[in-house]
Amino acid sequence: MSDKIITPKIQIQISKSLDYTPFDIKWLPYSTKLVIAGQTDSSKGIIQIYHLTKGKLDLESEFVKENPFKCCSFGASSFASRDLALGDFEGNFQIFDLEKGMPNYEIKKAHKSIIYAIDAVGGNMNYGTPEVVTGGKDGIVKVWDLRGDKPAILLEPKGIEKNNPECWSVAYGGCFNREERNLGIGYDNGDIKIYDLRMDKLIYGENFKSGICSIEFDKKNIPLNKMLASTLDSKIYLFDLKNFEKNNNLRYEKLSDEINYTTYWGTKFIPQKRDLFISMGGDGSLNLYKYNHSDVNVTEENNKNKNNGKITLINSNMVCTQPIIGFDWHNIKLGLSCLVAFDRTVKICTMNKLNIV
């Protein structure tokens, strides 16, 4: 008798319609609540908090603000607080207190126009002070120490300002003590860069010929290990960073969808099993992959783009009718996720059998 193939299933547990356009979604850490940030039909900003209870999503609170919101992060929030870092379409950056319903830190015109990407670190780990990084349409990346009102670090592409590539994605990684912090940055012209904040030095840069929609490290508070990037032209790159410092270049595995040819708006490692990750399809698909490590030892001769591991598609499900624009894994419950899409829905999804893949 042949062994039964075990395949995790991607299942929609809850689907709820929204009366506005969502752009980002996050679980409140260590809770069954989630927050959605977006834009109303009257071009206002909206924040909604939902509570997942008894198999349904209940709206708990709602805030409408002057400018529509593009991105958000809880990375600078402590366990005790519920402070959400937000970037909006007018270039404003704020830390919004969800309990009081108002910002407790705000920088007007942090960027000249829309803030496309935001990430934060330090709020819920004992490795340095809370910081927020923002990336904008102006092509500038700014790191904010929340004890001041000026950027602690400003990274601007060289050249004529009007020709600056737009910054579409930012992510913290390698934050494993009070000094070490690294940034992954992706641009609309296909540039991917890794910046060492402690050394104040660019440690990696390469062009991948298509806009970088997302950047993510597999875990923020460990030495650099793996990094994901997704592109407009239906490609996913998984970078092996373990031997990066020793060999001074990067191995990466490329996955290209030449059948569906859909934009991958984002990729997200599963926090409890970091060899597994999902992609958010422009066609509304949610795709689950596994990265299988290579058994070949890394040397300088075989390091770059040779003898890499392999990315395998585990399962896929068309969960939305339009692009999935925001996604978040629950940090405790394996396989539990939330997402928002341009079809104006929020969904709760589960993936089973992940512990035996």
Residue locations for each model-derived region?
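WD40-repeat beta-propellers
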Residues: G45-H51, F93-D97, V141-D145, I192-D196, ...
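Canonical WD40 repeat/beta-propeller blade segments in eukaryotic WD-repeat proteins
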Residues: Y20-W27, N67-A76, K112-G123, E161-C175, ...
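Structured C-terminal portions of repeat-based eukaryotic scaffold domains
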Residues: L202-V357
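Solenoidal tandem-repeat scaffolds enriched in leucines and small polar residues
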Residues: V121-E206, S210
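Structural hallmark of WD40 beta-propellers
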Residues: T32-I36, F79-A85, N104-Y105, M125-V133, ...
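Beta-propeller domains
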Residues: S2-I14, Y30-F63, F96-E99
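A short beta-strand motif characteristic of beta-propeller blades
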Residues: Q11-K16, D58-F63, M102-K108, K150-I160, ...
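Conserved strand-to-loop turn within each blade of WD40 beta-propeller repeats
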Residues: G38-D41, G87-E90, G135-D138, L146, ...
